[in-house]
Amino acid sequence: GLPVCGESCFGGTCNTPGCACDPWPVCTRD
């Protein structure tokens, strides 16, 4: 959910461990 991971995921995936592309295109932590 939150907070944001400081990463965008236009490609649909996040490189930051523990982060998910939700809501697209923003990476957030569970």
Swiss-Prot record:
Record's function text: Probably participates in a plant defense mechanism.
InterPro entries: Cyclotide (IPR005535), Cyclotide_moebius_CS (IPR012324), Cyclotide_sf (IPR036146)
Cysteines joined through disulfide linkages: 5-19, 9-21, 14-27
Alphabetical keyword list: Disulfide bond, Knottin, Plant defense
Record note on domains: The presence of a 'disulfide through disulfide knot' structurally defines this protein as a knottin.
Protein's organism: Oldenlandia affinis
Cross-link (Cyclopeptide (Gly-Asp)): 1-30
Highest taxon of the lineage: Eukaryota
Keyword Disulfide bond in record: yes
Name assigned to this protein: Kalata-B14
Family: Belongs to the cyclotide family. Moebius subfamily.
Changes after translation: This is a cyclic peptide.
A biological process from GO: defense response
Membrane-spanning ranges: none
